[in-house]
Amino acid sequence: MIKRKQMWDNVLTVIMTLLCLLWVYPIALIFINSLKKEGTFTTSTVFALPTKETFVGLENYTYGIFKMNFLSSLGYSLLITLTSVVLILLCCSMTGWYLTRVNNKLSKFMNLLIVFSMVVPFQMVMFTLSKTADTLKLNTPWNICIIYLGFGAGLAVFMFTGFMKSVPIEIEEAAMIDGCNPIQIFFKIVFPILKPTMISTAILETMWVWNDYLLPTLVLDIKKYRTIPMAIQYFRGGYGRVELAPMMACIIIAIIPIIILYMTCQKYIIEGVVAGAVKG
């Protein structure tokens, strides 16, 4: 029995190692080619390491940062991501708390709507959304955060609701007896308890908003506001010409913050998701 378990553990380790290599390989390939001279890509050299003739160091990175106006794009990406995530965490944690503590037909109906919003794909509403956002003048970084709140609320409320079902209501009743109003109860009692789910939700929503290309392209005024994914697209020139080396360099720059965030906070993602799933 023990030998069989060890065998399956070894098989599982091999499978997970292969999957890890499969996921890391595209990033490694992009990084290697970002160090090569532009115009040296062929089907036979794209998988090869840089040589003395093709290696250019960080030249593609400096050129890419200059061309894509990196600081401006970074500023807009940070503004949209941070504002959207803060709105999602604040509004959805309150909503999850309300849906858990208030048991009536309205709360049940709202819960169904939230679950339904997770099922409906963005592509079904993107053209209508784009037209509505243009009519209502929502094509600015501040206003797009409201749209992100709407699309990110489903997952966030689902996670907060699942976690809140495990929190004893007696804690809040004791605070109410001590004279706390609902706002004080939420921020002084409930909010600190939600920390594991809060962190995991923040990381998941941050990765989504930071990497999103479609929604900013449809909503934002691309002449004034460009996030990092939008700016990378402008390495595609006319007549099918693409500056591959600088584009790959900027892709690496764009994913570095997310990789660092995930590697430093991955334990919170697992804890938060598992807590919400098991306790819900």
List each model region and its residues.
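A structural signal for multi-pass alpha-helical bundles of membrane permease subunits
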Residues: 2-280
